[in-house]
Amino acid sequence: MLKQRTIKSIVKTVGIGVHSGRKVELTLRPAAPDTGIVFSRVDLPTPVDIPASALSIGDTRLASVLQKDGVRVSTVEHLMSACAGLGIDNLYVDVTAEEIPIMDGSAATFVFLIQSAGIEEQNAAKKFIKVTKPVEIRDGDKFARLDPYFGFRLKFTIDFRHPAVDKTGQELEVDFANTSYVREIARARTFGFAHEVEMMRELGLARGGSMDNAIVLDEYRILNNDGLRYDDEFVKHKMLDAIGDLYVIGHPLLASYTAYKSGHGLNNALLRELLAHEQAYEIVTFDDPKTAPTGFGFDAQTAFA
């Protein structure tokens, strides 16, 4: 059967919160089958566990934020994206602040952490959410949509009207049957505009943001000396975010995702819309890995790029 996965050993790192600017310690621990991805605020007098769930996402203005009983874990999308890309089903994520550290602004550090911990299969069938009917959410000209598809395919279009972004391509389509997440998506960094960063700092946000963890643009160009990691890094980062946003549903999706100018809020609304229509999806497993969609096998997802 196609099996669930966790990590083999505990791994730790330290980074800063992009909004708080404070030091955050992050520990990843193995978890038993059917645990899911569980975030734990270990800095509180009594630690609070918040399982990743589409219905636990609260604030989505600047990041995807998990909330439970007034306790928050913010900016979970890059770590969730790495878990999705490597096929990690079960994991404990201990964090000493209300923000997952931003690291380099991509998912690459989290991929490295998980790979260095080692990935192991567990004696339980991997569960997928198979979309059986189209589901769509619109907000003005923005939209996000899921269609039935035997695999996981994404098509994302951005529209930033900026000279540097225009040159790099605003549309990307990826099918993970023939694309390596680690090689093609994981290293794409978040990006922001210098004038927005200044405004956010005045509001007490983005205190940890810098060119070490983001692509920063002025009105005309990219300010980072080292340029871009991918020719189309902007749209690739939006896809990286979407993969993480969608993975909070708790299982990998078998679906085709199409989006235009979507963000954390619209992605979460799409998951809620799917879950509200029980006839639009089913939970499936694969007793024979050969019958599963290409790209979800252990070697396909966990090979070092």
UniProtKB/Swiss-Prot annotation:
GO terms for biological process: lipid A biosynthetic process. Its cofactor is Zn(2+). Keywords: Hydrolase, Lipid A biosynthesis, Lipid biosynthesis, Lipid metabolism, Metal-binding, Zinc. It holds the Pfam family LpxC. It comes from Burkholderia pseudomallei (strain K96243). The active site is at H264. GO terms for molecular function: metal ion binding; UDP-3-O-acyl-N-acetylglucosamine deacetylase activity. Pathway: Glycolipid biosynthesis; lipid IV(A) biosynthesis; lipid IV(A) from (3R)-3-hydroxytetradecanoyl-[acyl-carrier-protein] and UDP-N-acetyl-alpha-D-glucosamine: step 2/6. Zn(2+) binds at H78, H237, D241. Belongs to the LpxC family. Catalyzes the hydrolysis of UDP-3-O-myristoyl-N-acetylglucosamine to form UDP-3-O-myristoylglucosamine and acetate, the committed step in lipid A biosynthesis. This is UDP-3-O-acyl-N-acetylglucosamine deacetylase. GO terms for cellular component: membrane. Gene3D superfamilies: lpxc deacetylase, domain 1 (3.30.230.20), lpxc deacetylase, domain 2 (3.30.1700.10). Its EC number is 3.5.1.108. It catalyses: a UDP-3-O-[(3R)-3-hydroxyacyl]-N-acetyl-alpha-D-glucosamine + H2O = a UDP-3-O-[(3R)-3-hydroxyacyl]-alpha-D-glucosamine + acetate. It is an enzyme of class 3 (hydrolase).
